[in-house]
Curated annotation (Swiss-Prot):
Domain Cadherin: 157-264, 265-377, 378-488, 489-595, 596-699
Membrane topology: Single-pass type I membrane protein
Protein's name in the database: Cadherin-1
Modified residues (Phosphotyrosine): 755-757
Chief localisation class: other
Post-translational events: During apoptosis or with calcium influx, cleaved by a membrane-bound metalloproteinase (ADAM10), PS1/gamma-secretase and caspase-3. Processing by the metalloproteinase, induced by calcium influx, causes disruption of cell-cell adhesion and the subsequent release of beta-catenin into the cytoplasm. The residual membrane-tethered cleavage product is rapidly degraded via an intracellular proteolytic pathway. Cleavage by caspase-3 releases the cytoplasmic tail resulting in disintegration of the actin microfilament system.
């Protein structure tokens, strides 16, 4: 056991020597401290006996004294004055690594520390590593693993502990780190080389190895913040270039030096805290970072402190900062925004737990306002006036003062009218001045109340802090009387009347009342809007009458069976005021519209025609609409059929009964509604030269709904024959024109008691008819009168109009022939005419007894004087009279 301990002590000594080689100091300067920030000591077993030497730490105090007072933070270990670390009692390591701090004091009584790490290596490691306890963690000699004959070597069984080298070393370079040896160097000449980062890979040349001796060296100072660990591979080859060993991995760990100051994440930190905050209230957090090692050293262990506070009122230390977290909180009470709205702190961050390098930053703390000041009215009494009926009228401006921060919830005023149960007033806050603007929320009525005394209370958007009392103001409001417009009662009147309401009848009486009870005013009425001109109003009484027939189906003026008219009432006040009322006439439906088909124009193909759907429309309302009844009239059913398309009988299906000729057809369709209101509508139907559905209709001439081609040819032939007959009669009359003498004598030749007897009937029999009768057709004839004889009253024959149904054309011709035969005025005149009848005997007896004026015999004509005044002239001519 003693030999084993001596061997392990020798190994530790070799490790310590290697560490000294890497920790050379400049001779011209002395900096107190440990030679390394971290010491790593391997232990062969986890069970350590009392007095077991682990290793030795080196401390340079710059005083020349070889011994220094050390102490361990772990009570299980003891550090001698020369830096040797031993186990104080039997110890079992439960972890592969155990770390603790060793502290020492320099000549200025400043405490310094280093970290010691114990690594449990196991038996197989001890077998291949020969370390001196004085050589720290870096062995002086590294041996390639041996391969025993007959055994398969496991590469992972050979573990090389990391080699530590401090960063930022000073002195001459290159410096030896460790020597690498091969067991084959006794058999053959061995040459050594290294590869990896820092050797043949960037950064190239940081580490080199002597080709023959195997010494691994560092060529320049290292920077842990740039590269914290290097992984190299050592190679051993013979003189002919053959590998005598497998490559061995070497890990070089760069130990940290406190060469980086902490850096704040911001130059200026901003935070806020409410005024009046109690001690302990968190305000904000500052943070800093350090690029040094924060795992194995305290070089990045940052501690925060407050260096200064501005202003230092009301206390010097109003805030404190947590050393570890950087959280700034309130230390003492007394924060008042109105006195000190902001504080500026200078915060320091130092590594080595506050003992190392440091830096500073600013922390600006804003004291937030709280509602600790109530708004106050200034002044507290106001007076204003407002005209009645005005809404949103400005009455008065209420002034307040508030010491809280402007434009914050603790400053913004909220006004309330205390004694306003009907909510007739409202106070609006001016966002700029914070003043209260008192307005009317509803129209005031002078006749109801002439003056209001209001109490207005002011508060803030944010609730008061503490026991603050709201301020109150008194406002006196006088209502000014104005002439008010008449008011219709109700403002909208609804009246139901049938649409056939009689013209000139009174519909209703729509009147308004005068709200100004203190004034004696007269109201007149007139219609302001009557788009259909259906109404008129009595200007004195407001009675409304109809002036024209109303129509519910007038879509331009009637919406939803309602006709809207506006009535205005005007008083005679100063100024004149006018009120408006709305009259809603609900027109009750009357069955005044017969149903109509839609569409009325259709096209069918001649071959295999497709049926058409006809929709029945009726603008009336139920029950004056469906179900409808339909019927084809005027013989249309010969060629066409209709049937109902739905159970409600609101649409029809029209289709030809048989194949029809190409052309246009007139179909008479009779439709009747549920109340038997009917109407016959003519449908224009085109039969096209196509099959199935009509795409491009080829039309022919117009064809009657029931006529066939032979019937049409017969009618055309009859018309042609009639035209030829009329032409022949006109030619004949032009050759036999006779000028008739007037039947009565001229006015200047009128003589009493003189008759003309030379008119013998109607002249020649072949000319005794009116030529104008030849131009008459079978329709109604014009009336013929004479001015020489009294007219003879006789019945006018009734001619039947041409039927639309071609099947009735035969009856039409027969009946009209009979009517023509019984018409005495129709040619030819086949009755017996008497030409020698000269009328009955005259009351004046025959004139044949009178002698001619040429007779020589004297005649007595005195009796002519007895015949009266009409024969006086004749008596004077033949009687002689007194002139004789």
């Amino acid at each position: 056991m003693g030999a084993r301990c001596r061997s392990f002590s020798a190994l530790l000594l070799l490790l310590q020597v290697s560490s000294w080689l890497c920790q050379e100091l400049e001779p011209e300067s002395c900096s107190p401290g440990f030679s390394s920030e971290v010491y790593t000591f391997p232990v062969p077993e986890r069970h350590l006996e009392r007095g077991h030497v682990l290793g030795r730490v080196r401390f340079e105090g710059c005083t020349g004294r070889p011994r220094t007072a050390f102490f361990s933070e772990d009570s299980r270990f003891k550090v001698a004055t020369d830096g040797t670390i031993t186990v104080k009692r039997h110890l079992k390591l439960h972890k592969l690594e155990t770390s603790f701090l060793v502290r020492a004091r320099d000549s200025s009584h400043r405490e310094l520390s280093t970290k010691v790490t114990l690594k449990s290596m196991g038996h197989h490691h001890h077998r291949h590593h020969h370390r001196d306890p004085a050589s720290e963690s870096n062995p002086e000699l590294l041996m390639f693993p041996s391969v025993y004959p007959g055994l398969r070597r496991q590469k992972r069984d050979w573990v090389i502990p990391p080699i530590s080298c401090p960063e930022n070393e000073k002195g001459e370079f290159p410096k030896n780190l460790v020597q690498i040896k091969s067991n084959r160097d006794k058999e053959t000449k061995v040459f050594y080389s290294i590869t990896g980062q820092g050797a043949d890979k960037p950064p190239v040349g940081v580490f080199i190895i002597e080709r023959e001796t195997g010494w691994l060296k560092v060529t320049q100072p290292l920077d842990r913040e740039a590269i914290a660990k290097y992984i190299l591979y050592s190679h051993a080859v013979s003189s002919n270039g053959e590998a005598v060993e497998d490559p061995m991995e070497i890990v070089i760990t760069v130990t940290d030096q406190n060469d980086n100051r902490p850096e704040f994440t911001q130059e200026v930190f901003e935070g806020s805290v409410a005024e009046g905050a109690v001690p302990g209230t968190s305000v904000m957090k500052v943070s800093a970072t350090d690029a040094d090692d924060d795992v194995n050293t305290y070089n990045a262990a940052i501690a925060y402190t407050i260096v200064s506070q501005d202003p230092e009122l009301p206390h010097k230390n109003m805030f404190t900062v947590n050393r570890d977290t950087g959280v700034i909180s309130v230390l003492t009470s007394g924060l008042d925004r109105e006195s000190y709205p902001t504080y500026t702190l200078v915060v320091q961050a130092a590594d080595l737990q506050g003992e190392g390098l440091s830096t500073t930053a600013k922390a600006v703390i804003t004291v937030k306002d709280i509602n600790d000041n109530a708004p106050v009215f200034n002044p507290s009494t106001y007076q204003g006036q407002v005209p009645e009926n005005e809404v949103n009228a400005r009455i008065a401006t209420l002034k307040v003062t508030d010491d809280d921060a402007p434009n914050t919830p603790a400053w913004k005023a909220v006004y309330t009218v205390v004694n306003d149960p009907d909510q007739q007033f409202v106070v609006v806050t001016d966002p700029t001045t914070n003043d209260g603007i008192l307005k009317t929320a509803k129209g005031l009525d002078f006749e109801a109340k002439q003056q209001y005394i209001l109490h207005v209370r002011v508060e803030n958007e944010e609730p008061f802090e503490g026991s603050l009392v709201p301020s109150t103001a008194t406002v006196t409001v006088d209502v000014v009387d104005v002439n008010e417009a008449p008011i219709f009662m109700p403002a909208e009147r609804r009246v139901e009347v049938p649409e056939d309401f009689g013209v000139g009848q009174e519909i209703t009486s729509y009147t308004a009342r005068e709200p100004d009870t203190f004034m004696d005013q007269k109201i007149t009425y007139r219609i302001w809007r009557d788009t259909a001109n259906w109404l008129e109003i009595n200007p004195e009484t407001g009675a409304i009458f109809t002036r024209a027939e109303m129509d519910r189906e007038d879509a331009e003026h009637v919406k939803n069976s309602t006709y809207v008219a506006l009535i205005i009432a005007t008083d005679d006040g100063s100024p004149i005021a006018t009120g408006t009322g709305t009259l809603l006439l609900v027109l009750l439906d009357v069955n005044d519209n017969a149903p109509i088909p839609e569409p009325r124009n259709m096209q069918f193909c001649q071959r295999n025609p497709q049926p058409h759907i006809i929709t029945i429309l009726d603008p009336d309302l139920p029950p004056n609409t469906s179900p409808f009844t339909a019927e084809l009239t005027h013989g249309a059913s010969v060629n066409w059929t209709i049937e109902y398309n739905d159970a409600a009988q609101e649409s029809l299906i029209l289709q030809p009964r048989k194949d029809l000729e190409i052309g246009e057809y007139k179909i008479h369709l009779k439709l009747a509604d549920n109340q038997n209101k009917d109407q016959v509508t003519t449908l224009d139907v085109h039969v096209c030269d196509c099959e199935g559905t009509v795409n491009n209709c080829m039309k022919a001439g117009i064809v009657a709904a029931g006529l066939q081609v032979p019937a049409i040819l017969g009618i055309l032939g009859g018309i042609l024959a009639l035209l030829i007959l009329i032409l022949l009669l006109l030619l004949f009359l032009r050759r036999r024109t006779v000028v008739k003498e007037p039947l009565l004598p001229p006015d200047d030749d009128t003589r009493d008691n003189v008759y003309y007897y030379d008119e013998e009937g109607g002249g020649e029999e072949d000319q005794d008819f009116d030529l104008s009768q030849l131009h008459r057709g079978l329709d109604a004839r014009p009336e013929v009168t004479r001015n020489d004889v009294a007219p003879t009253l006789m019945s006018v024959p009734q001619y039947r109009p041409r039927p639309a149904n071609p099947d009735e054309i035969g009856n039409f011709i027969d009946e009209n022939l009979k009517a023509a035969d019984s018409d005495p005025t129709a040619p030819p005149y086949d009755s017996l005419l008497v030409f020698d009848y000269e009328g009955s005997g005259s009351e004046a007896a025959s004139l044949s007894s009178l002698n001619s004026s040429e007779s020589d015999q004297d005649q007595d004509y005195d009796y002519l004087n007895e015949w009266g005044n009409r024969f006086k002239k004749l008596a004077d001519m033949y009687g002689g009279g007194e002139d004789d």
